Amino acid sequence: MNERELAAWRARHIGLVYQFYNLLPVLTAFENVELPLLLTHLSKAERKTHVESALKAVDLADRMEHYPRQLSGGQEQRVAIARAIVTDPTILIADEPTGDLDAKSAEEILLLLTQLNRQYHKTIVMVTHDPRSERFVDTVYRLDKGVFIGSTTGGMSATPLQPSE
C-alpha cells in the first residue's frame, strides 16, 4: 500500500479515542461527531443519520445541540467516542479513555466500550495504566518499559503489575 491508500484504509477501519476529548469548543456535539464524515462523499442527510445513530449509541441523543462547555467530562468523552465510531470503523483504539475522569464516569465509559464491543462487534484496543479496567476486557497484554512481559485473561488479575526497578 502506498501512503495515500494506507491513510484511506486507516480512515475507514480505525477510530481513535484520546484521554483528552479533543472536541472543538465552538462546535456542538452533533458538529464535533460529524467532522470525520465531512471527508466522505456522504450527503448531508446521510451524515445526519450517521451522527444521530452514533450519538444514540453513546446515549447522548438528547445532547446533540450542546457545546462541550455544557457537558460533563463523561459526556464529553462519550461525544469523542461517538466521533470515533461515526464512520463505523472495525477497530477502535482508546488511549487512556478514562484517565481524565472521576471513578463513576470512568466506569460508565468502560461499560460503554464493552457494549460497543459486544453489540457492534468492534475490536477495541485500549491503552491504560488503570488496573481496574481489567474486569471490562477479554485479554490484558502487559508491557514494562515498552517490552511485552505477558498476557492474562481480563478480570482474572486484580493485582496491578509492579514496574521493574
List each language-model region with its residue ranges.
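ABC family nucleotide-binding domain
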Residues: M1-L143
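Conserved switch/coupling elements of ABC/ABC-like ATPase nucleotide-binding domains
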Residues: K145-S151, M156
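Long, low-complexity, intrinsically disordered segments
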Residues: Q162-S164
